[in-house]
């Protein structure tokens, strides 16, 4: 199963992950979240995401350095994101190609892929991604 969700605030991210986990409790939950909005990329606000991905079996966060630059914001360190989400299992990407390649390399047997963003994960084409993952 693949789900695309507009969740981007901490409460919505947590609620979406929990709802998917409740409905697909026997499946591996791969939760991908894009830090995309001005507030989500703010180093003071990012701590609000604490434990939001804790029910995901494989939690992933993506952010774009180009988005940070266009919003005239300071770079975020991977370790700061891991610490803010309070999840040492968190996988962080800032390169959409590497993120996509990682997803394609995964085994999706008995899995749910959850893509949460108000953006598009660095211009990833969801239809192409779905075709690649289902082959």
Region roles according to the model:
Residues 1-135:
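ATP-dependent carboxylate-amine ligase
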